[in-house]
Design a protein with these regions (language model features):
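Short cysteine clusters
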Residues: 18, 55, 103
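Amphipathic alpha-helical interface segments
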Residues: 24-29, 64, 77-115
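Acidic-glycine-rich active-site phosphate/pyrophosphate-binding loop
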Residues: 26-43, 100
Length: 115
């Protein structure tokens, strides 16, 4: 996981948004081309379309989890995926101060005030 974190950071430094950076970092393990990973996650950046709503990085996490664990042929899958995403949100909140997955709140907490 540290390797993907470093890769995500490198993508971010190249100018890709948070969501793109996360998904592209996992592209090799997901069997995706870099281009496909970057394209499929482009709209989730900056809190989904720069609306500062759900964190783009967290949207990237959900995309990766869905690609790895979702099974559309399994009728029980929806509940299992929701539980997995909820646990990921709990861990994400804990790692980022404990109370949010909302972009504007995370940025404010970090002292970042984007345009």
């Amino acid at each position: 996981m540290a390797k993907q974190g470093e890769a995500a950071y490198a993508y971010f430094l190249k100018g890709y948004n948070c969501s793109q950076s996360v998904v592209a970092a996992f592209a090799p393990q997901l069997g995706l081309s870099e281009e496909m990973a970057l394209r499929m996650s482009a709209g989730f950046g900056a809190g989904i379309g720069r609306m500062r709503e759900v964190c783009g990085a967290f949207c990237g996490v959900v995309t990766v989890l869905s690609l790895v664990y979702a099974d559309p042929a399994d009728p029980q899958d929806k509940s299992r995926m929701y539980a997995l995403v909820q646990e990921a949100a709990r861990l994400y909140r804990a790692r980022n101060g404990g109370d949010s997955i909302i972009c504007r709140e995370l940025l404010a907490k970090a002292g970042v005030h984007p345009e």
